[in-house]
Amino acid sequence: MIVTGVYDCTTGRNELLQCNTFFKSYNGKSIVVICDDYINSPDYIVSLYLNRGSECVNKISSLFVIISADSTGLHIMCDPYGSQWNLFYCVKDGLFYYSTSMKSLLSVCPINRTLNKNAAKIFLKRGFLIDGQTLITDIKCLTCAQELFFNQDGLHVQHYKYQFKICNYSKSDARNMLIPAIEDSILAYFSKADKSVSLPLSNGYDSNLIFNTIRKKCNDKEINVFTIGGVVGRNEIPAVKENIKGIRGVQHYTDIIDKELLRSFPDIVWRLEGSLFEGGVFLQYALGKLAQKAGITKMICGECSDEHQKSRFIKDMFNVTHGKYHPNYRYYSRANPFLTTHFVVLKKSSLMLNSFGIRGCYPFVNVTFTQLASILVSDNLNCLNLAYVHRRH
């Protein structure tokens, strides 16, 4: 999914050079919505946006990017988690260029391609970049809970205040509500018209919960599961084969990562466009390649489940979305579960799958799940484990 455009503040013209997603024109305003439309439809998001402006974010449950332009200026915003899609942008000669693809942006924007050396140092140390920096000096990237405005007064970027609702359920009620809430989120990602469902399947709780929910609620659909193992380290293929043995209607695709995958390193870098680098990208690359070969265009993934169950997640989300965080780079570490969700875990999966023409669906990146998890979570116990223990007793 690629959206590329250029906005001229002197004429108020927004020219879409590429757009294979939802577009609507309303009273002289053009609006592009890239969203998780299984959860919230683009029309619903546009309606909220037109009525509430930036405050629409507090009523939208899905991941999204909104691009709105009229004669007065351009406004772009993304969801609090930073979206599945990057939004790169730069300003050159009074024109504002933007795209969901770095390669596409570079093909239309006549800027000097200068390496951002400070950003490169951070990237080599952390594996990802923050505060909207990229590896190219003049190109920036919209990050979690951010919005930007561009008009004749120039460019203004800020964090909007996301009002996350804290629920006052008892722990007992939250335990009883957790699994049904996750099941509802999973089931929202496919319709009766879908003949099959596809997902990565490991030996962990999150993917098995997705798998068992689909089996239980949609036993009329074929299930395609994908497991990637490794020659070195943990190989979960045998365990997964044992778990699904004897279950009808399941097609199991597998692949093994070995040293030969290193030959694909240039292709991996090309697909991620300098957004991040982490050891897990090799697994994601193998997964995307295997799923593409099988003709899959949509996968339901368990990413971000662990991060949303960390005791610090809500606090870190509040600090980031309200601008109450220390600007020093050392603050941004893997110990921050909210930023890890945005900069590493979600993007690692979504960007790689998107590069193979596969849409990733993420039922654990869900407001209700986060609300319930925040009640149940503790430093030493994963709340999904807690829910399973509770049900077994």
Regions found by a protein language model. Give the residues of each.
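Cysteine-centered catalytic environments shared across enzyme families
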Residues: M1-D255, K259, F265
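ATP-dependent adenylate-handling active sites, centered on carboxylate activation for C-N bond formation
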Residues: G73-H75, Q152, H159, F164-H393
